Amino acid sequence: MEFKVGQDVSEIWNIHGSILPEVLMYMFPRSDESYDWEFVNDNGRHIFTAWRKSEPIPTLEEIEKAAIELEEKKNAPKPKTLEERVADLEKQVAYLTSKVEGTN
């Protein structure tokens, strides 16, 4: 389905845990959100009013696919910090040390 300037996008404004401008920033990370596209809130309706990028406007299918990827990325487990990894290793060393000492 085509996504057009002038379209009421209220039905897809909240899409897979993100709002539409967040999804567009995910799709076009080098964009200027305040310039490259524009939405207007018209009495609770979200109207897509401008697209100033050289790339074609993404289709609704592309937007939905990107929204799903963004949702998965947001829900992905965060990598452990160095301190957390060191603490885990210290626990493993303590456990293995107790096992070795217990066999002697």
Curated annotation (Swiss-Prot):
Q: Which UniProt keywords apply?
A: Cytoplasm, Stress response
Name the record gives this protein: SPbeta prophage-derived stress response protein SCP1
- The organism of origin for this protein: Bacillus subtilis (strain 168)
Localisation per UniProt entry: Cytoplasm
Q: One matching Pfam family, short form?
A: XkdW
Q: What induces it?
A: In response to low temperature and salt stress.
Q: Where is the signal peptide?
A: none
Give TM segment ranges: none
What's a GO cellular component annotated to this UniProt protein? cytoplasm
- Where does the protein principally reside? cytoplasm
